[in-house]
Amino acid sequence: MRTKEAVAARILELCKEKNIAINTLANTSGIAPSTIYSMLNEKSKNPGIVSIKKICDGLGTTVRVFFDCELFDDTEQEMR
């Protein structure tokens, strides 16, 4: 799995776990809905750590918790 796929899957997983809609997440995190949808649809080439931190804040979690899951254990090395 590529890193952006893992990020998208983790965002969806946490939204489902916390019963938060994507538009609600956008409002609470201060990120435009289009930016979050770009991350979820893997159109965002490189979801930045600042955006991920804002999403974590909107989800009421930490960056450590966000990345501490099996989705990120076997991500592929990505070459440009």
Regions found by a protein language model. Name each.
Residues 30-46:
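Recognition helix of helix-turn-helix/homeodomain-like DNA-binding domains
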Residues 15, 26, 56:
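The alpha-helix within a helix-turn-helix
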Residues 1-21:
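A short, Lys/Arg-rich alpha-helix, primarily the initiator
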Residues 14, 28, 39, 69:
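Residues in the recognition helix of alpha-helical DNA-binding motifs
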Residues 24, 35, 65:
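Residues in the helix-turn-helix
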Residues 43-57:
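Short, basic-rich loop-to-helix N-cap that marks the start of a DNA-contacting helix
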Residues 38, 64-80:
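Short, charged recognition helix plus adjacent turn
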